[in-house]
């Protein structure tokens, strides 16, 4: 708050969740030049508006598969999206969760002024980032000024390890919880982020996933469910997903996108049970054609209710990964 005010900026906060009905009129009124959002917002725009349009017919799908045509279509769509955001946007900062690869590729090819920031509440918060003119697909950028980053417990084969940080903005510790504080700091005082990552030769950070979410495959492979979920969520009929391990197999819990179902299947509500299994198989085949061998899913299980999420729109994974994926349950949103 203090910094933008000191620069003469006007700051606008939404007092309700940023649904399309809330966000669109606000953008038209405010016409922001700088905007900070969680990935879910831009992912929904990409899936429901951009991708849905370019996969709506055989003609569009054929064009979209051609590299130079896809880039051209993304550029045209990006100009329209800029108008939706008010036409004055210079910086769209995205953070709080991992951005879907398809959505980021669209932003990059559309030449949209976006950048991804990486940080935690405990580091107040920025650790790495880049300017919109410098972004690289899949990377959060180099360490921010005044921040040092390194990897701990690096796997010699993958070159990946836990990201640890040293910065003046890091917290001193958790309030009246010395045990938790001790766990998140190395012996030489660096903060353990709990995230797995790797660096390029010139120091750009690529985040692979949460250490606690990583699944160890049958032959010792490191499987990152977030990467599989990114592919799952790029399917036009998938709204959200969680990948979990069950009895040595990877199972995908999927909440389907009802708008996409309506567009793809006439009268889908009346005939859902008859074609649901075919759709599940379609999703399995779609994912397994795009991931490596040990990240292939064996099954899709429908999650009829929306996933329970945090205020920053992250799925509360622990509610789903610790139970039998076939278990019927009722969960209220929190």
What are the functions of these language-model segments?
Residues 158-159, 200, 206, 223, ...:
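Generic structural signal for well-ordered beta-strand positions
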Residues 167, 173, 196-293:
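AMP-binding/adenylate-forming catalytic core of the ANL superfamily
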Residues 240-248, 282-334:
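Conserved C-terminal "lid"/linker of ANL adenylate-forming enzymes
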Residues 1-79, 88:
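Conserved AMP-binding/adenylation subdomain of ANL enzymes
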Residues 8, 195, 317:
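Active-site-proximal glycine-rich helix-loop-beta segment
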Residues 11, 35, 72-205, 211-214, ...:
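Conserved AMP-binding/adenylate-forming
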């Amino acid at each position: 708050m203090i910094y933008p005010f000191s620069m003469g900026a006007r700051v606008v906060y939404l007092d309700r969740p940023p649904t399309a009905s809330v966000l669109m009129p606000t953008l038209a009124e405010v016409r922001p030049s700088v905007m900070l959002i969680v990935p879910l917002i831009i992912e929904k725009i990409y899936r429901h508006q951009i991708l849905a349009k370019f996969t709506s017919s055989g003609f569009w799908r054929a064009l979209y598969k051609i590299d130079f045509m896809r880039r051209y279509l993304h550029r045209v769509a990006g100009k329209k999206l800029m108008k939706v955001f008010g036409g004055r946007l210079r910086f769209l900062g995205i953070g709080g969760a991992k951005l879907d690869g398809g959505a980021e590729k669209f932003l990059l090819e559309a030449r949209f002024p976006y950048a991804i920031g990486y940080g935690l509440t405990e580091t107040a918060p920025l650790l790495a980032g880049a300017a919109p003119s410098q972004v690289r697909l899949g990377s959060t950028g180099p360490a921010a000024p005044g921040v040092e980053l390194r990897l701990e417990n690096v796997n010699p084969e993958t070159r990946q390890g836990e990201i640890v940080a040293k910065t003046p903005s890091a917290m001193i510790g958790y309030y009246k919880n010395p045990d938790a504080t001790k766990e998140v700091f190395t012996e030489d005082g660096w903060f353990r982020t709990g995230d797995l990552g790797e660096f390029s030769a010139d120091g750009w950070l690529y985040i692979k996933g949460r250490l606690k979410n990583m699944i160890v495959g049958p032959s010792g492979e490191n499987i990152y469910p977030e990467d599989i979920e990114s592919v799952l969520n790029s399917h036009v009929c998938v709204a959200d997903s969680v990948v979990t391990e069950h009895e040595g197999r990877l199972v995908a819990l999927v909440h389907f996108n009802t708008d996409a179902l309506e567009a793809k299947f006439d009268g889908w509500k009346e005939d859902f049970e008859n074609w649901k299994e075919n759709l599940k198989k379609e999703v399995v085949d779609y994912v397994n054609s795009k991931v490596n061998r040990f990240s292939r899913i064996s099954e899709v299980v429908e999650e009829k209710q929306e996933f329970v999420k945090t205020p920053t729109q992250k799925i509360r994974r622990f509610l789903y990964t610790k139970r039998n994926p076939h278990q019927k349950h009722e969960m209220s949103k929190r």
